[in-house]
């Protein structure tokens, strides 16, 4: 995982390098060939780098490192959405992953906000919110005593998956 972390750090530096966004390179590409232009990552690729970095740190059992990447990802998401909100969709998986890290760190307020944003992002996407994610988010918010947040999601109390239905009928928690 250490090598993966280093490689993603290099990729991020390359992406942030002013040379890759050079006006001279753009002008040369217009006059000659597009292949002269250095590759620039698309917004979803930038966010994917953060997803993998968070997963790398979690795999190493380095919660502090994962939390740093979560905070960096939040800054990157905000920057991307402010730059071009019409072209950039909210990233439900990254929001959900961030919520999990906040939850593991005991930062319940940040976790609740991230869970809420994850559900909203999934709902607004073509993919939709997986029932299992909604189950987990609902139970996490309930555990945090955030019934108002659950109601604000405008979803039924528990998603109708076989596991949730069986557990609900038995009167147990997930």
Where are these regions (language model features)?
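Second-shell loop/turn segments in exported
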Residues: 35-40, 52-63
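Short loop/turn and low-complexity linker motifs enriched in small/turn-promoting residues
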Residues: 147-174
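Short coil/turn linker motifs that delimit alpha-helical repeat modules in TPR/alpha-solenoid proteins
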Residues: 41-44, 87
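A mature extracytoplasmic/lumenal domain signature
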Residues: 53, 70, 168-170
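Repeat-mediated protein-protein interaction surfaces in helical alpha-solenoids
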Residues: 24-38, 72-83
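"A position-specific structural signal for the A-helix of alpha-solenoid helical repeats
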Residues: 45-55, 59, 90-104, 136, ...
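TPR/TPR-like (Sel1-like) alpha-helical repeat modules
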Residues: 2-17, 57-58, 64, 68-75, ...
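Boundary/linker segments of alpha-helical solenoid repeat arrays
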Residues: 15-26, 78-88, 119-149
């Amino acid at each position: 995982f250490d090598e993966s972390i280093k490689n993603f750090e290099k990729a991020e530096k390359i992406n942030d390098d002013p040379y890759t966004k050079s006006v001279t390179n753009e002008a040369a590409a217009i006059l000659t060939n597009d292949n002269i232009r250095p590759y620039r990552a698309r917004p979803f690729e930038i966010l994917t780098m953060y997803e993998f970095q968070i997963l790398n740190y979690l795999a190493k059992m380095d919660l502090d490192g994962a939390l740093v990447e979560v905070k960096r990802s939040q800054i990157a998401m905000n920057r991307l959405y402010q730059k071009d909100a019409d072209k950039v969709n909210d990233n439900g998986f990254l929001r959900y992953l961030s919520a999990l890290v906040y939850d593991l760190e005991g930062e319940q307020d940040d976790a609740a906000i991230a869970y809420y944003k994850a559900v909203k992002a999934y709902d607004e996407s073509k993919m939709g919110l997986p029932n299992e994610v909604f189950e987990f988010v609902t139970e996490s918010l309930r555990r945090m005593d955030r019934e108002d947040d659950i109601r604000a999601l405008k979803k039924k109390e528990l998603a109708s998956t076989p596991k949730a239905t069986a557990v609900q009928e038995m009167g147990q928690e997930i």
